[in-house]
Amino acid sequence: MVKNLLVELGLEEMPAYVVTPSMKQLRDKMGAFLTDHRLTFEKIEMFSTPRRLAVRVVGLADKQSDLTEDFKGPSKKIALDADGNFTKAAEGFVRGKGLTVEDITFREIKGEEYVYVTKEEIGRPVEEIIPAVTEVLQALTFPVSMHWANNTFEYIRPVHTLTVLLDEQAFDLDFLDIKSGRTSRGHRFLGKETEISSADSYEDDLRAQFVIASPLERGDMIVEQIRALEEEHGVSIEIDENLLNEVLNLVEYPTAFLGNFDAKYLEVPEEVLVTSMKEHQRYFVVRDAEGKLLPHFISVRNGNAEHLENVIKGNEKVLVARLEDGEFFWREDQKLAIADLVEKLSNVTFHEKIGSLAEHMERTGKIAALLAKEAGLDANETADLARAAAIYKFDLLTGMVGEFDELQGIMGEKYALLAGENAAVAAAIREHYMPTSADGELPDTKVGAVLALADKLDTILSFFSVGLIPSGSNDPYALRRATQGVVRILDKFGWNIDLAQLLGRLYGLKFDSLSYDNQEAVLDFFRARVEKMMDRSTPKDIVTAVLQSTNFVVRDLVETAALLAEKAQEDNFKSAVESLSRVFNLAEKAQGQTAINPALFENQEEKDLAAAIEKVELTSDLAANMDQLFALSPVIDAFFDHTMVMAEDEAVRNNRLALLASLTAKAGQLAQFNQINTK
């Protein structure tokens, strides 16, 4: 017989961003708890609002499954003394399992007998296990926690109720000074405390108190209401998924409505209006059929439609205050000179250990100049890059960005155009922030891409140089994102820039403000980011081999790893890699010996290998390069079959090691083949 179990935790309002992850965490931990306690179930349904986290376990077994376990003990010769009596070793073993020597049997394993005992545990009724579900609630982790009242414990928010029901049966449990039962709380204003009749009636009982417990249902309600408003008013409404997910975690009973604002504010840049509505007020944006912004917005009330006109007026009033700020800053910022703002950046701290923003920009400018040549920018693009690098942070001191920091770069582009800067310079100011997330949009222009690279590279090198290096999940300065941005930009534009060589050149730059340090740590940091770009199905040993190659062109690394993973399925892969691995292993003993003297060759196989290596010409065609190297396998094998590399004659030995090193110098540009496992 199966049952349904409901566990609901009632709290003060949680931050919207915490709700969904916490709900999923509760589901996962509850599932693990039940499995650990040998309780089978059909599925776990999730519920959440800003004021509750809940799960319903459907099809829960009414008792634990029985457990039969075999335990292996000491060997028979240790378990029995000379008289055939059980020794203390045997007695201690069974005592530890809660059994007696009478339960001992012997089993033969590889010709020797060992003590075995079988322990049987009869499954307990589910009612006896349920009180321990408070362990699940205690195990939940949150990004922030708090104390309340005089309690010593911490939790995401103060806990008010705990509802635990097995079908209709309520349980009296203790959790954080709260007694459980069947009581839950309705909507803060429209509902009241209510009794949950059973696990199955949970949604209906709360719905009667103006709480929609299912986040999926709340989301569907919001979308349906928005579409109805869209049809009613003949407009087009953007339903941003991220905004929708946030809004549905701000309300327990959603009611969407349309509000208005004065059309005069449409003269302010659209990005300002959209930011005011979406980021600050959590409003949905309204457009016409052609995509033009309209002086309306959609908001979602936490409640029903009663007195909705008052709610609309209140929201309109709040938004107007925001739009007034935006209009004011837009007007006043245009009175500022870019040169004056740039000059003031010397008084703005980039980081107390690193220096000012002006110093950061100076270093970025030098890096950008170096990258311009590497990326093949023409004279006009190089000039645009230099100008952009000289001013690109100026908008941080404008009133608009001070109020709406999400608009940094975006407003820089607009103000730059108004000040007469050309479009390429203005676009680069906006694009240098890209990508703003792990999979965010990348720059479209070469000038913007190079400026983004230079800015990110100085940021990474500067923080590493003063010891501010990410550890574990801690990355307060978003250096992983910056590094991933560098890697993704290089990959998108396909620039043949070797990151290792580039970093070497950057570490050679001299600045009055800072000296770069920690080069090897930075390189390892980049390797980790490149690895993230590789196909997850690529074997780890291939990834390692490729990342240890002497080539650090991002696109080449990614393509080489994919190519090797593909070739690993071919018949000749094992023999070719093993041949190359022997070369790599021995070449390590060359110790810098590079000069090859053909006069010291003592057999035809040496000459053949030297000639074959000479013919290997690496190009941009990675597949062709790999084919050339794999084709050397029979020549390499013949060489090893007829040649003693570590000859007694030092000159001959060094000559043979140098020959092998000449091959690894070429093959090592693709991978360190001796890192690939062929077993």
Swiss-Prot record:
Location in or out of the cell: Cytoplasm
Keywords assigned: Aminoacyl-tRNA synthetase, ATP-binding, Cytoplasm, Ligase, Nucleotide-binding, Protein biosynthesis
GO molecular function, one term: arginine-tRNA ligase activity
Annotated catalysed reactions: tRNA(Gly) + glycine + ATP = glycyl-tRNA(Gly) + AMP + diphosphate
Enzyme class: ligase
This enzyme's EC code(s): 6.1.1.14
Coiled-coil portions: none
One Gene Ontology term from the biological process aspect of the record: glycyl-tRNA aminoacylation
A Pfam family: tRNA_synt_2f
This protein's record includes keyword Zinc-finger: no
InterPro entries, per the entry: DALR_anticod-bd, Gly-tRNA-synth_bsu, Gly-tRNA-synth_heterodimer
Domain of life: Bacteria
Any single GO CC term annotated in Swiss-Prot or TrEMBL for this entry: cytosol
Subunit field text: Tetramer of two alpha and two beta subunits.
Annotated family: Belongs to the class-II aminoacyl-tRNA synthetase family.
Name of the protein this chain belongs to: Glycine--tRNA ligase beta subunit
Organism: Streptococcus sanguinis (strain SK36)
Lineage of the organism: Bacteria, Bacillati, Bacillota, Bacilli, Lactobacillales
Gene: glyS
